């Protein structure tokens, strides 16, 4: 019984936050790094997502933002493959369920990795910002943020690869920064995710970048901030937005095929459109196009639209190691405000990898990193074994490691 309790506690901790489960490019679905299964496999599938342990909690920045973990997450190692995209393509990143209390900006970067993203030293990558959405609406405390737009869009986010960048191999760094406890130094929580891309096209720009360990400081105004006070503006942390970045009014798209990441180095990137190797999906999803919310007046950064990205359907795939996680995490048909479950021809059994919603577990004990108190909080105040409820501010208490 103790082993079962321990395992349940572990699952609760793992599902307390989020990670990117898959990406979609031009209707083609590519699996991400499935944290609940791939870390335990001797020969996991080749994906474009960088590899991390079975953890999706925040990066530990208690000693500052110079930790290597801030680059691509905890103990991240290079992805074994890449996905080919054309400059100007839009990439949809599908997160698992994101807690609605973890307000903050959503930011995306690119870094040129030279000849081979699978072997590049991550500490040498220099990132330039291609997308950022911070404070959208400050009419009510704590405000509406980029992550709220992500949640509304079925926990997905869409970003466009700038048309002006030169062809080559790049690492896409996509991140949510949760600010619910950012009123004290070291309280902001970073959740970076990385993917290897081979970008084709005819652009010529090679934007200057910033080392991952130099993107932020503990006292940056967008990192050290009390979101429970009235904010008229918010300075999105990190370097300025690349001048060639495009603010897009997004619409959801249908998944028409499944694709597999290409193993190894990308080699020399060609001009023209990307040509992914795909198989037709047995089922696809459609959604009603939506318009991006106006938000540039609130964020002190270059204009950027709120994402209303595409919603993955459950593609039928012959890859045994990934069918369960795909079916449980992306088998939905969604408009911006409506979620409906679809049924595929070969539905998989429920998986422990299905993300748990934030909040209280059935036992009355909250998982690690979940809210356990605060002004007007009505849920349980207990935490799972090994965790304790810590008061971050009058509005928010959180389960943290004891």
Curated annotation (Swiss-Prot):
Residues 364-400 form the CBM1 domain. InterPro entries: AA9 (IPR049892), AA9_LPMO (IPR005103), CBD_sf (IPR035971), Cellulose-bd_dom_fun (IPR000254). It catalyses: [(1->4)-beta-D-glucosyl]n+m + reduced acceptor + O2 = 4-dehydro-beta-D-glucosyl-[(1->4)-beta-D-glucosyl]n-1 + [(1->4)-beta-D-glucosyl]m + acceptor + H2O. One of its GO terms (biological process) is cellulose catabolic process. Its main location: secreted. Disulfide bonds join 72-194, 113-117. O2 binds at residues 180, 189. Keywords: Carbohydrate metabolism, Cellulose degradation, Copper, Disulfide bond, Glycoprotein, Metal-binding, Monooxygenase, Oxidoreductase, Polysaccharide degradation, Secreted, Signal. Binds 1 copper ion per subunit. It holds the Pfam family AA9. It comes from the Eukaryota. Its cofactor is Cu(2+). Has a modular structure: an endo-beta-1,4-glucanase catalytic module at the N-terminus, a linker rich in serines and threonines, and a C-terminal carbohydrate-binding module (CBM). The genes for catalytic modules and CBMs seem to have evolved separately and have been linked by gene fusion. This is AA9 family lytic polysaccharide monooxygenase E. It comes from Emericella nidulans (strain FGSC A4 / ATCC 38163 / CBS 112.46 / NRRL 194 / M139). The gene is LPMO9E.
